[in-house]
Regions:
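Substrate-binding/active-site clefts of carbohydrate-active enzymes
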Residues: 2-21, 29-170, 185-207, 211-214, ...
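Active-site-proximal helices and loops of the catalytic beta/alpha 8
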Residues: 2, 21-24, 47, 77-90, ...
Length: 317
C-alpha cells in the first residue's frame, strides 16, 4: 500500500490497551497513524532494558503477544483506530534473534529459548562474523552482534510471510521492518550466489497490500534508492543530506528515534537535546517530507503538545 502523506506517532513504551484510550486525542493532534512496539516475545523480560524487546525468540505468527499486549488487544486497537480513520503499524523483527549472551561466538548464536527447529538448522543462520558496516557484502552476510537470519532461505521466508499475514488478519495496516538493511535486494548480485528473492516472495505472499517501511539508517543515497527501487518499499531513515536527494515520496523520515534517544555514546545523539529542540526539528522534517515519524520519549507526553498539533496541521498535505 502506498501512502503519499502520513504522520506517524511512535509509542513504543505504551501498552496497546493504553493506546486505545488515547486514540481520539491522537487524531486531534493531527497524526494519521500509530506505530506500536515490537509485539513478538523476547528471550527475557525487558521491563528495564528497552533493547531486549528486539532480541526476539520467535517469528511465528502463533506466538504474537508480549508485555505490551495480546492479539486481542491488537485487534481491538486496530478496530477502534479504523473507526476514526487512523492506521496501525507494528514494529516487526525478523532479521535476527536474541543471542545466548556473553562474548565471542555466543553473542552470534541463537538463545536456547528459540525454537529448536530454527535454532539447530545451520542453513537458517548467517556467518558468525561481526558486520563491517563499511562493506555491503558484510552487512548482508554477517551478524549484527546478534544471531542473524539468512532471509534468502525459502523456508524462513514462508514463516515470515505467515507472521505478517497474522498481523494482517488482526487488522494491522503496515509494518516497520527492523534492521532492514541487513537484507540484500533482489538484483544485488554477489559472486557465486543466487539472487535473494526475499522481497519479491514476501510481498507476493501477503494477503493484502500493506504499508512497508524498512529501517535503513545512516546510509548513502545509493543504498537508500536500492531499497526504494529494487526492493520497492518505503525507507525509514534519519534526516540526512542523502535523504534530501532521493524520492521523498518513498521515505518515512525521522529526526529522533528510540535508538538516537535511548542508546549510549554517539548512537544516542539526540539524548542531550531538549524536547523543544526535538519538536522544532520535527517541524522541519514535516515541512520537507510528506511522511514522518514522531518518537514519543518514554514517560513523557511530548506528542500532546500544542506545537506538535500545529506542526501536523500546518504541513498537512
Amino acid at each position: 500500500m502506498f501512502k503519499y502523506y502520513d504522520r506517524v506517532l511512535h509509542l513504543p513504551e505504551d501498552k496497546l490497551i493504553d493506546i486505545v484510550n488515547k486514540l481520539p486525542q491522537i487524531k486531534e493532534q493531527g497524526f494519521t497513524s500509530i506505530l506500536t512496539s515490537v509485539l513478538q516475545p523476547s528471550k527475557e523480560e525487558w521491563n528495564v532494558a528497552w533493547h531486549m524487546r528486539y532480541q526476539v525468540n520467535s517469528i511465528y505468527g502463533k506466538d504474537i503477544g508480549n508485555l505490551m499486549g495480546s492479539k486481542d488487544d491488537l485487534k481491538l486497537l486496530c478496530n477502534k483506530a479504523h473507526e476514526i480513520g487512523l492506521s496501525v503499524y507494528v514494529d516487526v523483527v525478523f532479521t535476527h534473534f536474541g543471542n545466548k549472551g556473553g562474548i565471542g561466538l555466543n553473542e552470534l548464536t541463537p538463545h536456547e529459548s528459540v525454537d529448536e527447529v530454527l535454532r539447530n538448522n545451520p542453513y537458517y543462520w548467517k556467518n558468525k562474523n561481526r558486520i563491517n558496516y563499511n562493506d555491503r557484502y558484510s552487512i548482508t552476510h554477517d551478524c549484527n552482534n546478534l544471531a542473524t537470519l539468512r532471509l534468502d532461505n525459502f523456508d524462513l521466508q514462508d514463516i515470515i510471510i505467515d507472521l505478517v499475514n497474522t498481523y494482517i488478519d488482526l487488522g494491522v495496516d503496515g509494518i516497520r521492518i527492523d534492521s532492514c538493511k541487513l537484507i540484500s535486494c533482489p538484483h544485488e548480485y554477489f559472486q557465486n550466489e543466487y539472487r535473494n528473492m526475499f522481497f519479491e516472495r514476501f510481498k507476493q505472499g501477503l494477503k493484502k497490500d500493506i504499508v512497508l517501511f524498512g529501517e535503513v539508517i545512516n546510509e548513502n543515497k545509493e543504498i537508500i534508492e536500492l531499497y526504494q527501487n529494487d526492493a520497492d518499499i518505503d525507507v525509514l531513515s534519519n534526516i540526512s543530506y542523502d535523504l534530501y536527494n532521493v524520492d521523498k515520496n518513498k521515505v518515512y523520515s525521522f529526526y529522533e528515534s528510540h535508538d538516537t534517544f535511548l542508546n549510549e555514546g554517539c548512537m544516542g545523539y539526540t539524548k542531550r537535546l531538549t524536547t523543544d529542540e526535538v519538536i522544532k526539528n520535527y517541524g522541519y522534517a514535516c515541512k520537507d517530507f510528506p511522511k514522518t515519524v514522531f518518537y514519543n520519549r518514554a514517560k513523557t507526553d511530548m506528542w500532546k503538545r500544542e506545537d506538535v498539533r500545529l506542526i501536523n496541521n500546518t504541513y498537512k498535505r
